């Protein structure tokens, strides 16, 4: 069963997909979105769900360090609810605290240029969210 992981931001959605056995996560793409124009990338996510035969979606929930829900986490919750109604599959929220920071550190340690980091950071964060989910549930 393939599972999709999403790192939802205000400008992009990082996408990762699990292998068919649900053991490892691989980055797929970064979808450009524009919240101010109500362009959220739902159609592209649905295309990827169909292409990869996804059966479940995991959306990162960026809780605050004190475990509270801030504005970004509220946006992620709404995104997950709308996505679930549009694709007709279960959508799970997953604590993603510090995944973007960890992804940034990983890319810096790998000596990836600032320009390239900007291109792949959300996809890598989606991989980290999904891999955390897979490691915990398998």
UniProtKB/Swiss-Prot annotation:
Its EC number is 3.1.-.-. Transmembrane segments: none annotated. GO terms for cellular component: cytosol. InterPro entries: RNaseH-like_sf (IPR012337), YqgF (IPR005227), YqgF/RNaseH-like_dom (IPR006641), YqgF/RNaseH-like_dom_sf (IPR037027). Signal peptide: none annotated. SUPFAM superfamilies: Ribonuclease H-like (SSF53098). It comes from the Bacteria. Keywords: Cytoplasm, Hydrolase, Nuclease, Ribosome biogenesis. GO terms for molecular function: nuclease activity. GO terms for biological process: rRNA 5'-end processing. Its main location: cytoplasm. It holds the Pfam family RuvX. It is found in: Cytoplasm. Could be a nuclease involved in processing of the 5'-end of pre-16S rRNA. Belongs to the YqgF nuclease family. This is Putative pre-16S rRNA nuclease.
């Amino acid at each position: 069963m393939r599972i999709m992981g999403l790192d939802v931001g205000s400008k992009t959605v990082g996408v990762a997909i699990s292998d068919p056995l649900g053991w490892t996560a691989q980055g797929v793409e970064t979808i450009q979105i524009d919240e101010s124009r109500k362009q959220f990338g739902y159609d592209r996510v649905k295309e990827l769900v169909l292409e990869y035969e996804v059966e479940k979606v995991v959306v990162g929930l960026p809780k605050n360090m004190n475990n509270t829900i801030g504005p970004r986490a509220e946006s992620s919750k709404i995104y997950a609810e709308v996505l679930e109604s549009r694709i007709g599959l279960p959508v799970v929220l997953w604590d993603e605290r510090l995944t973007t920071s960890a992804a940034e550190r990983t890319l810096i340690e790998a000596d990836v240029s600032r320009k390239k980091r900007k291109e792949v950071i959300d996809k890598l964060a989606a991989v980290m969210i999904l891999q955390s989910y897979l490691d915990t549930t398998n």
